[in-house]
A protein has these predicted regions:
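Intrinsically disordered, low-complexity regulatory segments enriched in Ser/Thr/Pro
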Residues: 1, 44-86, 125-151
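A cross-family detector of function-defining hotspots
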Residues: 33-45, 51, 108-122
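Generic hydrophobic, helix-prone segments enriched in Leu/Val/Ile
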Residues: 14, 57, 91-92
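Short, solvent-exposed secondary-structure boundary motifs
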Residues: 23, 42-50, 91-93
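Short linear motifs in intrinsically disordered
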Residues: 31-36, 53-58, 99-105
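Amphipathic protein-protein interaction modules
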Residues: 78-129
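Negatively charged, low-complexity tracts enriched in Asp/Glu with abundant Ser/Thr
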Residues: 1-40, 121-151
Length: 151
């Protein structure tokens, strides 16, 4: 499929991360599946590596979005500046190479922590569904190995 200029540029940013890890392009990568509703101006890719965290990368003419587990729009950027492009690239590298811990309090509060190879926390994201309060629920914890190891 042919994609718009914006989508192609977003793919290039992701591919830079993959190439730095000596891996193939995201479009040729065995661990990513293209969603059936993808078209010229919209591309949705799902991670399908067995026993790994589920996440989606959504590329469109307005920017990028990343959903992790049940948390939607964990990252939502327009990529309209070099600073946003750099942040996106760094986030993708963390997503691809980190151990990930998901701590859920009900279905309305999710804490996602990313750990490097030394098991040091490098990033934490909190997802709270609007108009909800669920800290009274017992927390569930899941941990996932990195999609790719970085050396």
């Amino acid at each position: 499929m042919r994609y718009s200029k914006e989508i192609v540029n977003q793919i290039k940013i992701i591919d830079e991360v993959l190439y730095s890890l000596n891996l193939p392009s995201i479009l040729k990568n065995e661990y990513f599946v293209t969603d059936t509703i993808s078209c010229e101006n919209y591309l949705k890719l799902h991670n399908n590596k067995p026993n790994n965290i589920f996440f989606s990368i959504i590329l469109n003419s307005f920017g990028v979005q990343i959903d992790i587990d049940e948390a939607k729009e964990i990252l939502d950027l327009s990529l309209s500046s070099p600073k946003e492009e750099k942040y996106f690239k760094e986030f993708v590298k963390i997503l691809f190479t980190s151990f990930i811990r998901i701590k859920k309090y009900g279905k309305y509060y999710i804490k996602i922590s990313f750990f490097n190879q030394k098991r040091e926390c490098v990033k934490t994201i909190r997802y709270i569904k609007i108009n909800s309060f669920s800290l009274n629920f017992k927390a569930t914890l899941k941990e996932y190995a990195p999609l790719y190891l970085s050396w």
